[in-house]
Regions:
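Transmembrane beta-barrel wall of Gram-negative outer-membrane proteins
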Residues: 1-36, 61-72, 76
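Short loop/turn motifs that connect adjacent beta-strands in outer-membrane beta-barrel proteins
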Residues: 19, 78-80, 138-145, 216-219, ...
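Gram-negative outer-membrane beta-barrel transporters
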Residues: 218-219, 324-326, 344-431, 505-506
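Surface-exposed loop/turn segments flanking beta-strands in extracellular/periplasmic regions
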Residues: 40-53, 104-113, 160-197, 237, ...
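Conserved C-terminal beta-signal and adjacent last beta-strands/turns
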Residues: 122, 146, 303, 391-509
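Membrane-embedded beta-barrel scaffold of Gram-negative outer-membrane proteins
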Residues: 74-76, 80-88, 92-100, 265, ...
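Structural signature of Gram-negative outer-membrane beta-barrels, strongest in the C-terminal barrel
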Residues: 15-17, 124, 143-155, 162, ...
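Face-selective signature of the C-terminal outer-membrane beta-barrel domain
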Residues: 69-92, 115-236
Length: 509
């Protein structure tokens, strides 16, 4: 299976004066790769076949062109105020041409996987403009760090979807298939396609926001702020092979989302903190429902509190935090109509505890570690079972990464890193209140993945140029694991096998 990828990301900075700087960042990516839907579930787990097995037609590809550019201007108005203007534009054009897993035909033990043919060209454009005023001043004995900003945005998306829906599985030879246990047993057809969706969407977004971080005392800090969002979304459904006429739906909504936080330092190495935030986000322009209607915005509330501790003069830092997050209208793949369409869940809740530690143990020796216990469940819904665990969310997960750079001698600048990432078992799909509306549940096993890296860094390798060379190794033990599922038994994504990626970074100053 061959993948082609080109990625460029140039960045330029210009000090126009002692008070004004301009920064330009660009990004271009070309990607052409087979459409890999991973493996399939059998029984309560994933099929016992190699993760390298490709269950589709490798000659069918997803071809993507993506470009993004950002221009940011900073201007120091005075010693207390700074102005920022940023404009970002992005365009993505893709062609999705697949013969991919659809469903198992007959007994699962036979391994006959029906394949569906799809053609989906898509174009997405987004343009955003931000203007912000940053402040750093005092009122009496109270210090303030403030931000006031306004954001304008527009997103446009258009997509046409055609497919054969897997063909006629009741007639041998009338549908494409592959045997998951023996991929030499297969039949790839090129059937006539039916256009089942042709839609374009436009989102217009206006946001205004403010924030103030107030130092009431040297050991007492308060933050408060908020954001007001107004958006207008229009979807136009063009004629397809099921609908002969066009239709248009429009949705306008607004919300104010506050945030507040407090941090108190009873003793120098210890900080107690608590935060409350609300969120409001229009659904992306590319989201599609089976009936062509628009989705309500995603809304959320989050509570967090914990303790931070610093040791050895701040060289080692750790945090323990409790959190409780609730979100409404979270989109997921439609279990009744296929993953090209979405449905919104009523409410999902995630609560748990996080622990992390980071710092320098000895000169040149750094460590980062974290652990999280996350209980993510559906709490309110008409389709999915209330109280059921959300897919792809493990109760336990954590990571450890440590690096060492030699500080002197002929090996100065050389370094190495080693670490691990672990996840517990996860559900593959949502459970439905009525089992007839969802596929049978299954689990993805927990795993531990080992990673490593080699480094070389040198200051002033050329005039005013620093160098960082790295080789990163992922899954060095080539362990079999699964990164997630897409709410279907036939789409279980495999984790990457042993991979080595080299990089060179030059930093000009």
């Amino acid at each position: 299976v061959k993948t082609e990828r080109i990625f460029l990301a140039p960045t330029f900075g210009w000090e126009m004066s002692s008070r004004t700087t301009l920064r330009f960042e660009a990004e271009y990516m070309y990607d052409r790769a087979p459409i890999d839907r991973g493996l399939v579930a059998i029984g309560n787990g994933v099929a016992p076949i190699p993760v390298s097995r490709f269950l589709g037609d490798p000659s069918r590809k997803l071809e993507t062109h993506h470009g993004k550019a950002t221009i940011t201007l900073w201007h120091d108005i005075s010693n207390m105020f700074r102005w920022r203007t940023a404009f970002r534009t992005a365009v993505t054009s893709s062609r999705y041409s697949s013969l991919e897993s659809n469903f198992l035909v007959g007994a699962e033990s036979d391994g006959i996987l029906n394949l569906a043919r799809y053609e989906i060209p898509t174009t997405v454009q987004s343009h955003y403009l931000q203007n912000e005023l940053h402040g750093n001043f005092t009122t009496g004995s109270i210090k303030h760090k403030t931000i006031i900003g306004i954001e304008l945005g527009r997103e446009n998306s258009s997509a046409t979807a055609s497919g054969d829906f897997g063909g006629d599985t009741s007639t041998p030879g009338a549908f494409s298939y592959i045997n998951i246990f023996n991929t030499n047993d297969r039949l790839f057809l090129n059937p006539a396609l039916t256009k089942f969706s042709d839609a374009s969407t436009q989102n217009n977004i206006l946001g205004a926001y403010f924030g103030d971080q107030v130092d009431l005392l040297d050991n007492l800090h308060v933050h408060f702020g908020g954001r007001f969002d107004l958006f207008d979304q229009t979807i136009t459904n063009h004629p397809d092979d099921f609908t002969a006429t066009s239709s248009q739906n429009n949705k306008t909504d607004s919300a104010f989302s506050p945030s507040v936080g407090v941090a108190y330092q009873p003793w120098k190495p210890i900080t107690l903190f608590a935060n409350y935030t609300e969120s409001f986000a229009p659904q992306s322009a590319g989201s599609r429902s089976i009936n062509g209607n628009l989705f309500n915005p995603e809304r959320g509330k989050s509570y967090e509190g914990g303790i931070k501790y610093q040791a050895f003069g701040g060289r080692l830092r750790s945090t323990v935090a409790l959190f409780d997050t609730r979100k409404k209208n979270v989109l997921t793949a439609d279990p009744l109509n296929g993953f090209f369409f979405s449905v919104a869940t009523g409410e999902q809740r995630s609560k748990g505890v996080e622990f992390d530690i980071a710092g320098q143990i000895l000169p040149g020796w750094d460590i980062i570690a974290n652990y999280a216990y996350i209980d993510a469940r559906v709490t309110k819904d008409l389709l999915f079972a209330e109280g059921s665990r959300a897919p792809n969310s493990a109760l336990h997960q954590g990571s450890l990464w440590t690096t060492y750079f030699f500080q002197e001698g002929v090996v100065q600048g050389f370094g190495a890193g080693i670490g691990m990432y672990a996840q517990g078992k996860r559900n593959g799909i949502f459970q439905c209140q009525d089992p007839a509306n969802c596929q049978a549940p299954f689990e993805m096993a927990g795993y531990v993945r080992m990673d490593a890296a080699l480094y070389y860094r040198k200051q002033e390798v050329f005039n005013k140029t620093n160098l960082l060379a790295a080789i990163n190794f992922t899954n060095v033990l080539d362990h079999r694991y699964f990164s997630g599922a897409q709410n279907f038994r036939e789409i279980v994504y495999t984790g990457a096998p042993f991979t080595a990626i080299g990089s060179l970074k030059f930093e000009f100053h």
